[in-house]
Structure formats: structure tokens, C-alpha cells
């Protein structure tokens, strides 16, 4: 049976329990939002195929449990991940502080060249905000990681986040292919950014 996609990207959602990883996954994969909190047991995944620059990309997105007792299970899935989204809750300061610990886990268990993004979820709850957007941006700059605020509930920036991570993986793959074929003729077609800006992040505001 012929493949229906050009690339398969394995993505990982990590972060403390309750920050909204599962809600982000459901919003992106099924455009749905569940108001009932159900803690992920171990690990789960969803699949969505997107199109970038004329290529069909199958995203296999793994949703990991944030509880400490599942840490040994979830770290096994770091291997082979091409992109990792570190999620915190803007209304929960501790979940933001723990992002540094999650980054340490990535450095210990994931590939050294994995693409990463820090995502501040629940920005629709601005009245309960404990973590400013500026603090999120600064942390991302300190680690050289992209940053975005999003809301699984309102869907604000959810598509943007996953597409940006996928595009960064695609760009890296393309660069590697070009490097490996630079000495020969008829190398792969260069995939270029359609947007003039590196990324076009939107501010999350309550209207």
C-alpha cells in the first residue's frame, strides 16, 4: 500500500500534570475541547497530516503524563522525537518554574538536535495569570528556544505552534539533505520559507 504522506514527524508534549497538554492535542488533532480534566495515564498519541510547502507531513504527536510516577515511562519516548513542545500553564507559576527541569530531561534523554518550543497555555485566562508573557519570552531566549502563548480552549495559536515546530523540523531536514548532497548534482529540491518573517506569532489578548 502506497504511503499517503511524504514525511513522518514524531512530536512530544511534555510538562507538568494539568497544564493542558491533552487539551492542546485534542484541539489540534480534532478541533475539540473537553472541559473535564482527565489526567493522562502513561502516554497516548494522536495523528494529524498537514501540508507544508507542497509536502504532506504526518504528525505523530505523543501526549505524556506529567506525574513523577510516570517519568520512567515517558522518558523512553524522548528517543526518536524530532520535536518537543514544553507546556506550562500561565495561571500556575510552579508549572513554569518546572520547565527548566523538563529541559534538563530533554538534554538527558532526547536527541541533541531535537527541535524545541516553550508554550504557555491557557492564555484565555488572563485574569488569573501568574506568569507574564515577558518571563516566558526571557526563558525561551535564555535556552535558545522558540516561545508562544496559546489557548486550547479558544484555539488561539494552537495551529501556529504545531505548524511552526513542524516547519522548523522540515527546515532542519532539508538543510541536512542539502549538506549530504552538496557534492553531487541533482540534489533535493530546496524547501523555502513562504513567509518573509521567521515566525509570525500572535499576541494572546482577551477581546
UniProtKB/Swiss-Prot annotation:
Superkingdom of this protein's organism: Eukaryota
Recorded GO CC terms: endosome; endosome membrane; phagocytic vesicle; phagocytic vesicle membrane; plasma membrane; synaptic vesicle; trans-Golgi network transport vesicle
Modified residues (Phosphoserine): 180, 183
Coiled-coil annotated residue ranges, if any: none
GO molecular function: GDP binding; GTP binding; GTPase activity
Reactions accelerated catalytically: GTP + H2O = GDP + phosphate + H(+)
Motif (Switch 1): 31-45
Modified residues (Cysteine methyl ester): 204
UniProt membrane topology term: Lipid-anchor
Secretion signal, residue range per the UniProt entry: none
Subunit structure: Associated with actin, delta-catenin and alpha and beta tubulins. Interacts with OTOF. Interacts with PEX5R. Interacts with RAB3IP. Interacts with VIM. Interacts with CDH1. Interacts with MICALL2. Interacts with GDI1, GDI2, CHML and CHM; phosphorylation at Thr-72 disrupts these interactions. Interacts with MICAL1.
Domain notes: Switch 1, switch 2 and the interswitch regions are characteristic of Rab GTPases and mediate the interactions with Rab downstream effectors. The switch regions undergo conformational changes upon nucleotide binding which drives interaction with specific sets of effector proteins, with most effectors only binding to GTP-bound Rab.
Protein name (Swiss-Prot/TrEMBL): Ras-related protein Rab-8B
Name of the coding gene: RAB8B
